[in-house]
Amino acid sequence: MDELQLFLDRYPSTILKDSCNSMIFQLRGKLETKAWKGAELYFTTSKYQSASKALQQFMNDWPTSRYAEEAQFLVLKSQFLYAEQSTSRRQEERYADAIESYFTFAARFPESARLNEAEQFHRKSRTGLEKASTEQR
């Protein structure tokens, strides 16, 4: 991909310009899909802490991805599930992370079909946070 871009930079008026741009577009699509599948795999295998980090990295690298909505939703879901599995002394912080992820999801995708499900995770996270805060006292 870098070589194709270098070629286009060196020869901007080449007759191969459209072909090179098409190849670059296809390669970027493959890289995006590979990054998505890798991040999604952590979630599928119930490695929620790793899933959250990998999905957030995916969102940083590919903010306009066709997978962006699903990735942001899975960040929320993985943070919630990670908080659920955590020890009581760590739950407060992790539920707070899930709540923050809900607000990010709702702000970025206010028309999402998954917004109702996200709201359920938000409610459960708030309940979990309140419970964890009470237990810490």
Residue positions per predicted region:
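Acidic, polar-rich low-complexity tracts and alpha-helical solenoid repeat scaffolds
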Residues: 1-137
